[in-house]
């Protein structure tokens, strides 16, 4: 459901007209699972999800309140069942708690029956025993807590009007339950934790290949957030699954996490990544070309990986990534005075000096993708929005007012790149020039 001002230039499809209805929907929100926001926050030392927070989309200055339930039920998005990988246990390919991993598969049809899109779910990381033990009690660490059905929206939609290039492909969402971007391979017996992300990746691919993916004429590996990072890490592995005759490419959405300096002068995300790498023994599964010259933690950062990925890769990212602002640039641990509290949740409340700091972050991101964008095989869509994950959201992927750069929307840019219909190296001007953004605003 959406709530919007009547004079808004953005006309949402669903509008709450009844105050009573709005209150009921807001109460229902606590019972609903999340769809879009894959962020994590630290609460009492544990990784919690932004699902706990009310969030808004702001389009062209208009605030739009959204709850997940009606967006799915009224728009009639397909609900796709969870498949547990029964052969995974014998391979040691299990979630943090030892439960079976899984995926959701919606079969393709017509001209797309032999094409495959595999989406890797995101959801942050756990960097300490305590965080990972907590994560075992959520869908991010155990299939026991995963939804039995989820809606397929955005790039996973089966409707040509919502997803023109991939709607009739076999579309898969691989669930994320290892806390290490599908890359770990270790365990902690004392805490009864299994860090088996790499094995989950292998088990999922083997299962999908057996279900017809090995006959794919075209394949796309995509993912959002921690799943977007996993795409970069696993892209060449995915490419090697197929013969040279298969068109294989990769799309990383909101996975370009920078090794950035935070507002206190420290490196909050580097500290988190160092914990993940150490705890999950990631160094054995990180790209060898990187660990031969850099330390393992550095090799978990995309900026040190993307130029060496051989398989065609598309980087889609918001230049003012909401997750990175909240958890890397201005986390509470780096802002004890709370001077960033308002800006962290709402870009419109940032001071001039805070915006200047964020502009420096954008400049660094732009500079880091310039070399990557030079080869014709690669694509870039770097929009100057306060957002995170734009492929699975109907409103940002291919809606009437979806974000665009030079009048080209995200879905069109990705399609042009994948099918080689035209150029797709799009880098936006700096904030506040882009009036097409669907910026995220949060309220605790």
Swiss-Prot record:
PANTHER family: NOTUM-RELATED, PECTIN ACETYLESTERASE 2. This is Pectin acetylesterase 2. It is found in: Secreted, Cell wall. InterPro entries: PAE/NOTUM. The keyword Glycoprotein applies. The active site is at residues 225, 321, 388. Its main location: secreted. The lineage of its organism: Eukaryota, Viridiplantae, Streptophyta, Embryophyta, Tracheophyta. One of its GO terms (biological process) is cell wall organization.
């Amino acid at each position: 459901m959406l709530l919007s001002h009547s004079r808004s230039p953005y006309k949402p499809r669903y509008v709450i007209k009844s105050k009573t209805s709005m209150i009921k929907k807001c109460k229902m929100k606590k019972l609903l699972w999340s769809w879009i926001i894959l962020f994590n926050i630290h609460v009492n030392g544990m990784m919690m999800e932004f699902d706990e927070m009310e969030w808004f989309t702001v389009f062209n200055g208009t605030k739009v309140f959204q709850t997940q339930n009606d967006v799915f039920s009224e728009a009639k998005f397909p609900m796709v069942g969870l498949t547990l990988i029964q052969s995974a246990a014998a391979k040691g390919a299990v979630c943090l708690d030892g439960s079976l991993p899984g995926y959701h598969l919606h079969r393709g049809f017509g001209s797309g029956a032999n094409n495959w899109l595999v989406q890797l779910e995101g959801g942050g990381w756990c960097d300490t025993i305590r965080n990972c033990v907590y994560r075992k009690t959520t869908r991010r660490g155990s299939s026991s807590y995963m939804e039995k059905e989820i809606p397929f929206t955005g790039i996973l939609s089966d409707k040509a009007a919502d997803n023109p290039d991939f709607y009739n492909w076999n579309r898969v969402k691989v669930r994320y339950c290892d806390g290490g971007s599908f890359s770990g391979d270790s365990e902690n017996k004392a805490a009864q934790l299994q860090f088996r992300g790499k094995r989950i990746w292998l088990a999922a691919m083997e299962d999908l290949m057996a279900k017809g993916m090995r006959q794919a004429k075209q394949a796309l590996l995509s993912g959002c957030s921690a799943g977007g990072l996993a795409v970069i890490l696993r892209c060449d592995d995915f490419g090697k699954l197929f013969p040279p005759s298969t068109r294989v490419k990769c799309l990383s959405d909101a996975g370009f996490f920078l090794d950035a300096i935070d507002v206190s002068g420290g490196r909050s995300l580097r500290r988190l990544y160092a914990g993940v790498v150490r705890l999950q023994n990631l160094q054995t599964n990180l790209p060898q070309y990187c660990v031969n010259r850099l330390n393992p933690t550095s090799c978990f950062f995309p900026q040190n990986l993307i130029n060496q990925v051989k398989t065609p890769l598309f980087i889609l990212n918001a230049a003012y990534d909401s997750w990175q602002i909240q958890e890397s640039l201005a986390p509470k641990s780096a802002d004890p005075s709370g001077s960033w509290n308002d800006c962290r949740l709402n870009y419109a409340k940032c001071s001039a000096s805070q915006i200047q700091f964020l502009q420096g972050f954008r400049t660094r991101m732009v500079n880091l993708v310039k070399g990557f964008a030079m080869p014709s095989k690669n694509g870039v869509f770097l929009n100057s929005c306060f957002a995170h994950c734009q492929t699975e959201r109907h409103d940002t992927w291919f809606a009437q007012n979806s974000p665009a750069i030079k009048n080209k929307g995200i879905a069109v840019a990705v399609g042009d790149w994948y099918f080689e219909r035209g150029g797709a190296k799009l880098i936006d001007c700096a904030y506040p020039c882009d009036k097409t953004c669907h910026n995220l605003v949060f309220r605790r």
